[in-house]
From Swiss-Prot:
Domain 4Fe-4S ferredoxin-type: residue ranges: 2-29
Organism: Moorella thermoacetica
Residues noted as binding [4Fe-4S] cluster in the record, renumbered to the chain: C10, C13, C16, C55
Record flagged with keyword Heme: no
MF term (GO), any: electron transfer activity
Cofactor annotation comment: Binds 1 [4Fe-4S] cluster.
Keywords: 4Fe-4S, Electron transport, Iron, Iron-sulfur, Metal-binding, Transport
Name this protein carries in UniProt: Ferredoxin
Leader peptide range in chain numbering: none
Protein function: Ferredoxins are iron-sulfur proteins that transfer electrons in a wide variety of metabolic reactions.
Entry superkingdom: Bacteria
InterPro entries registered for this protein in UniProt: 3Fe4S_ferredoxin (IPR001080), 4Fe4S_Fe-S-bd (IPR017896), 4Fe4S_Fe_S_CS (IPR017900), Fe-S_cluster_ET (IPR051269)
Pfam families linked to this entry: Fer4_13 (PF13370)
């Protein structure tokens, strides 16, 4: 599984980072970004999917 963050839609609410800190982190501009090339299977896979579902601006997409 791979995910992306649309920087134009991100409002820096931090939901994805709270839910899945091993996949998302803050960038230098204070927005969320993906820190792994591919989300590991298992627990991380589920927290990444939860981040996709919980993002209030739908900035996170599974690709």
């Amino acid at each position: 599984m791979k995910v992306t963050v649309d920087q134009d839609l991100c409002i820096a609410c931090g939901t994805c980072i709270d839910l899945c800190p091993s996949v998302f982190d803050w960038d230098d501009e204070g927005l969320s970004h993906v820190i792994v090339d591919e989300v590991p299977e298992g627990a991380e896979d589920s927290c990444a999917r939860e981040s996709v579902n919980e993002c209030p601006t739908e900035a996170i997409k599974e690709v």
